[in-house]
């Protein structure tokens, strides 16, 4: 991979991946097992797990700029959105919906996660939420 052809983040991520490629299958198995165990513990008691989409309000433009180092972006991304990663990698169904606006008028999202294979439950919930509280665009579309 030619460093001149990629943004710093993409180049750093590629190098990190290539350095750790032999560990990736094991890491994915561990994550899937962890999520399976969590799924059994939590989703046996609850239909939906509700978390914020992000841990902070909408950051300024450039907060996750691809011109930053991959290490810095990963640090910021993991602090900014610590809740979505597990579902994204493990395959546990989840969706994020805009549920309101902050004091600056920026969207605030909630993530809804269901048990493994409960995709239909999430879609039904999203439909009900949309019917009860339709999203209004921030700007004229």
Predicted region positions:
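Short helix-loop capping/hinge segments that flank enzyme active sites or metal/cofactor-binding pockets
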Residues: 1-40, 52, 56, 93, ...
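Structural helix-boundary/capping segments
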Residues: 25, 88-141
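Structured helix-beta-strand junction loops
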Residues: 30, 44-45, 132
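A short, aliphatic-rich alpha-helical micro-motif
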Residues: 42-43, 87
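Conserved acidic residues
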Residues: 47-49
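Short, surface-exposed loop/helix-turn segments at secondary-structure junctions
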Residues: 59-80
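Hydrophobic alpha-helical segments in the ANL/AMP-binding
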Residues: 77-90
